[in-house]
């Protein structure tokens, strides 16, 4: 399956938060003009990308072009001269200025190094800084994808039910692997689903992911509200893998309508949009709420009947609609699981029981102790860079 012209341009590359913003036209001619300056005896090369300094090992050669901006920095496409492949390099500037951001970077590195799956983005390299003592910027090299689902859905690229099936299947196939490693992604949304022109899909941006037994729930970052499950909106502390399935349901609805399903302006509005579609939960659906206050709050909200999905999604195939109704369930314990979703008739033509691998070992993030300073994290990331580049570059 292909998309015409790679679908919608813009690259949402691995951008932490806010998804990267594709560059839209206007710079085509300028791309060739970004010239590199060799530094450190020719072992590194420095590029000035529209005022952003980009210093990478000299095996990364032009053409260099900016493909996205995340909350944490700029992302450029550049060529690895040794493999002749184009890669994406994310610069995280001043990565060790505060503990939360430093830990987020470390977490993404450790998680993606642990994982190996077609539908999960992989890290190809971590650039070894020229000097350990001046190590402030982290450069992570990923495989390059052409675009992301957010940009594709906002483009005028026609999409069929086959596209929808294939995207959904790949998200679930990747998520099965992620969940089998005891990891919850927690931030699935269209801009974190990376695509190429062949419609291959990879899950990106694991900066907010958590293992299932970690309990610092949701303290440091606000996950995009629109894709957030009811139990997160209601501050439920014991959430499960079902939070990611809710997000996949929101994404499935958005693939078909090309509009966000629940674009809440604040969390009260968010809950209202959800209950207007799936109906207000009855008491038997509130067992997951440990807090009486939360239960009282939900009961005090305006009550809505469940909407007919056929009326809301007139163009959606009946298979997709049935799966969507099983994903958008208020009670997380009654929501379809990733394994059940892969077995759903809607995905029967793609489902391949022996080709949906799980992760051989659970991931554990051993760096949560509060005593870990920014300097400690810098040392751990430095060692990760040395694993990719054991020898100093001569």
Swiss-Prot record:
GO biological process, one term: intracellular signal transduction
Enzyme class: transferase
Stretches the record annotates as Disordered: 1-33
Domain of life: Eukaryota
Catalyses which reaction(s): L-seryl-[protein] + ATP = O-phospho-L-seryl-[protein] + ADP + H(+); L-threonyl-[protein] + ATP = O-phospho-L-threonyl-[protein] + ADP + H(+)
Induction: By infection with rice blast fungus (M.grisea).
Organism whose genome encodes this protein: Oryza sativa subsp. japonica
The protein's name in its UniProt record: Mitogen-activated protein kinase 2
Family: Belongs to the protein kinase superfamily. CMGC Ser/Thr protein kinase family. MAP kinase subfamily.
């Amino acid at each position: 399956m292909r998309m015409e012209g790679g679908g919608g341009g813009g690259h949402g590359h691995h951008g932490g938060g806010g998804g990267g913003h594709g560059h839209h036209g206007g710079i085509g001619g300028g791309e060739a003009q970004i010239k590199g300056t060799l530094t450190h005896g020719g072992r590194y090369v420095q590029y000035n990308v529209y005022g952003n300094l980009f210093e990478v090992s000299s095996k990364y050669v032009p053409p260099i072009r900016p493909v996205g901006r995340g909350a944490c920095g700029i992302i450029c496409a550049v060529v690895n001269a040794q493999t002749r492949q184009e890669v994406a390099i994310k610069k995280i500037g001043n990565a060790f200025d505060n503990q939360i951001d430093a830990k987020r970077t470390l977490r993404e590195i450790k998680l993606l190094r642990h994982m190996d799956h077609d539908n999960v983005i992989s890290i190809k390299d971590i650039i070894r800084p020229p000097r350990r003592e001046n190590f402030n910027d982290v450069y992570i090299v990923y495989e390059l994808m052409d675009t992301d689902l957010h940009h594709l859905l906002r483009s005028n690229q026609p999409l069929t039910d086959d596209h929808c099936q294939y995207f959904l299947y790949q998200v679930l196939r990747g998520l099965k692997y992620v969940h089998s490693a005891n990891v919850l992604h927690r931030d699935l949304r269209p801009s974190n689903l990376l695509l190429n022109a062949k419609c291959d899909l990879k899950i990106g941006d694991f900066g907010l992911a958590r293992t299932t037994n970690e309990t610092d729930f949701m303290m440091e970052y606000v996950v995009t509200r629109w894709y957030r499950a009811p139990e997160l909106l209601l501050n439920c502390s014991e959430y499960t893998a079902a939070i990611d399935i809710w997000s996949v349901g929101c994404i499935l609805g958005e693939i078909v309508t090309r509009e966000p399903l629940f674009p809440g302006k604040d969390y009260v509005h968010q809950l209202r949009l959800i209950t207007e579609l799936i109906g207000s939960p009855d008491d038997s659906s509130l067992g997951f709420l440990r807090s009486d206050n939360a239960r009282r709050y939900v009961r005090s909200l305006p009550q809505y009947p469940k909407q007919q999905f056929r009326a809301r999604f007139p163009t959606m195939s009946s298979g997709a609609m049935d799966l969507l109704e099983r994903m958008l369930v208020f009670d997380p314990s009654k929501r379809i699981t990733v394994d059940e979703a892969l077995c759903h008739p809607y995905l029967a033509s793609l489902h391949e029981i022996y080709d949906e691998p799980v992760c051989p070992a659970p991931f554990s993030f051993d760096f949560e102790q509060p005593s870990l300073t920014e300097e400690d994290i810098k040392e751990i990331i430095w060692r990760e860079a040395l694993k990719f580049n054991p020898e100093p570059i001569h």
